Amino acid sequence: IAREHGLEVDEASFKSSMEEHRLASGAGKAMGSLGGEGVDIYRGLLAELEANGSLPNTGVAYDPYSRRQVDGVLLGLIANGKPVTQANLGDNVEVIIPDSCFYIESGGQVSDHGVISAQNEEWEIQIQDVRKPAAGMIVHIGTVTFGAPQVGDKAVATVDAQRRQDIMRNH
């Protein structure tokens, strides 16, 4: 467009000035966390789970419409941004299971709440949020309310059906 109007642009100086401005303005840090900062952790864990056969190459199965409960295995736990093999009472964790019946926030409808618990009832995690931090990866975010869940434990994921119904009715 500049050439069409007989103007010249010093692109090198422009790029240099833009970089100086970007750094002086905090390089976008004033906005805080924009999401996606920890995506490599999720991608790495997903690749590992696909490679060892725990997940298909399509990742975590997602069907929040036909079921409100699924059985599975605790494939992964993330605490403080790092994969762990076990969590303890009071820990805030992200839980990975092979199949999710929890609705992920979309189109103005909030994520489901519910419980992921051991099939043998030795532990329980109250789920307060569900996210998809990378393609194929779904994490259930919650707090261990009793016991000590471990990767490899058999688990049951149960959506709070009353809460979902109330949200759907008002959405």
Describe the residue ranges of each PLM region.
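A glycine- and charged-residue-rich anion-binding loop/surface
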Residues: 1-171
